[in-house]
A protein has these predicted regions:
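N-terminal Rossmann-like NAD(P) cofactor-binding subdomain of oxidoreductases
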Residues: 1-195, 230-232, 282, 296-297, ...
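Charged docking surfaces used in two-component/phosphorelay signaling
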Residues: 73, 162-337
Length: 337
C-alpha cells in the first residue's frame, strides 16, 4: 500500500515534453516525497538529462521493463503510449496517473480533479485519469455553484493556448510572429493554418456531428467528474495565439436562483479558486496573470439577463500546471495521504 511508505519511486513518462517537464518541476515545488525519480521518454530523447532537486537525472528509454519497482507513474506522452504502457505499469504494481485521453471515459478508471471529486481516487485499479486541461479549470470553478444550486446546462467557449498542443506549437507561434513581422510568409506545420495573429476554431479532429473531439471531451468529462449525467453541456473550443493560459467564457443555467454576489461569495472560499473580479477597477483574469500559478482564476461574474436562473463567468488557468501537471501531482498526493 502506498500509504504505508514515506517516500516513493516515481516514473515520469514523457519527461522531456512540456507537461512532463512541468510534472518534474511541480514534484519538487510541492515537496512530494520522492525516493527516486525515473524520467522516461522515447529512444530519440533518451540519454539526455532533467534537473531534479539540484541533480541531473538521466532520461531512460521507455520499455516494457521500465516499471519494475515503481510506485507511481505519471504519464504525459499521448494516448497511444498510454494505451500501450499504462496496463504494463499497472500490472507491475505502479499506480498510473495518466494525462492523456486514453482512459478518461473508461468506466473502471476514475477521472479526478482533487478539488471536485477526490473520493473517486479510492476506486482505482492502478490507473487514474487526469482530465482534459479545459475541463479541469471549468469544473473547479463550477463545482461550488453546482453544490449550492445545481447546474442544469453549461455553454462554454474556450480560448486555448498553443502550449496545449506542445513544444512544437509554441515554437511555431514564435517563428510565425518573427516571420510575419519581418514581412515573410508564415509556414504552418503544426496547425492547418497560421496561428500567429489568428484564431482557429478547430482543436483535435472533427466528428460527423460537426463538433470536435476536444469539444466532446468537455461534454463527457464534465458529467463524469461532477457525477451528474443529466447536466447538459455544449462547447466550442478555439486555439488562440497565446503561449500559456487557457481562458473560458462560461454560461450556466441553474435549477435555483443564484445572484452574482452569492456566486462571488461561494467562489471566494472555494478550494483552488482565486476570485479576481472587480470590473470597475479593470480587474479580471487574463492568461498573463495565471502563467506559473496553480489556481483557477474567476472573474466577470454577472447574471444572464436572458433567462431567470443564469450566470456568466470568465475562467482562466495555466493549462500546463493546473490543467495538467499540477492536477496529476495533486492526485498523487491524495494517494499517499
Amino acid at each position: 500500500m502506498l500509504k504505508d511508505k514515506t517516500a516513493y519511486r516515481v516514473a515520469v513518462v514523457g519527461a522531456t515534453g512540456a507537461v512532463g517537464a512541468e510534472m518534474i518541476e511541480i514534484l519538487e515545488e510541492r515537496k512530494f516525497p520522492v525516493e527516486a525519480l525515473f524520467p522516461l521518454a522515447s529512444a530519440r530523447s533518451a540519454g539526455g538529462t532533467v534537473l531534479f532537486q539540484g541533480q541531473d537525472v538521466i532520461v531512460e528509454e521507455l520499455t516494457n521493463d521500465s516499471f519494475k519497482g515503481i510506485d507511481i507513474a505519471l504519464f504525459s506522452a499521448g494516448a497511444d503510449v498510454s494505451r500501450q504502457y499504462a496496463p504494463i505499469a499497472a500490472k507491475a504494481g505502479a499506480v498510473v496517473i495518466d494525462n492523456s485521453s486514453a482512459w478518461r471515459m473508461d468506466k473502471d478508471v476514475p477521472l479526478v480533479v482533487p478539488e471536485v471529486n477526490p473520493h473517486d481516487v479510492e476506486h482505482h485499479q492502478n490507473i487514474i485519469a487526469n482530465p482534459n486541461c479545459s475541463t479541469i479549470q471549468m469544473v473547479v470553478a463550477l463545482k461550488p455553484l453546482h453544490d449550492r444550486v445545481r447546474i442544469k446546462r453549461i455553454v462554454v467557449t474556450t480560448f486555448q493556448a498553443v502550449s496545449g498542443t506542445g513544444k512544437d506549437a509554441m515554437d511555431e507561434l514564435m517563428d510565425e510572429c518573427r516571420d510575419l513581422l519581418s514581412f515573410r510568409a508564415a509556414e504552418p506545420k503544426v496547425y492547418p493554418y497560421q496561428i500567429a495573429f489568428n484564431c482557429l476554431p478547430h482543436i483535435d479532429d472533427f466528428l460527423p456531428s460537426g463538433y470536435t473531439k476536444e469539444e466532446m471531451k468537455m461534454v463527457n468529462e464534465t458529467r463524469k467528474i461532477m457525477g451528474d449525467a443529466s447536466i447538459q453541456v455544449t462547447a466550442t473550443t478555439v486555439r488562440v495565439p497565446v503561449y500559456v493560459g487557457h481562458s473560458e467564457a462560461v454560461n450556466i443555467e441553474t435549477e435555483h436562483k443564484i445572484t452574482a454576489n452569492e456566486a462571488r461569495a461561494l467562489l471566494s472560499i472555494a478550494p483552488g479558486v482565486i476570485l479576481y473580479d472587480d470590473p470597475e477597477h479593470k480587474i479580471y483574469p487574463m492568461p498573463l496573470d495565471v502563467a506559473g500559478q496553480d489556481e483557477v482564476y474567476v472573474g466577470r461574474i454577472r447574471e444572464d439577463e436572458s433567462i431567470p436562473n443564469g450566470l456568466n463567468l470568465w475562467v482562466v488557468a495555466d493549462n500546463l500546471r493546473k490543467g495538467a501537471a499540477t492536477n496529476a501531482v495533486q492526485i498523487a498526493e491524495l494517494l499517499v495521504r
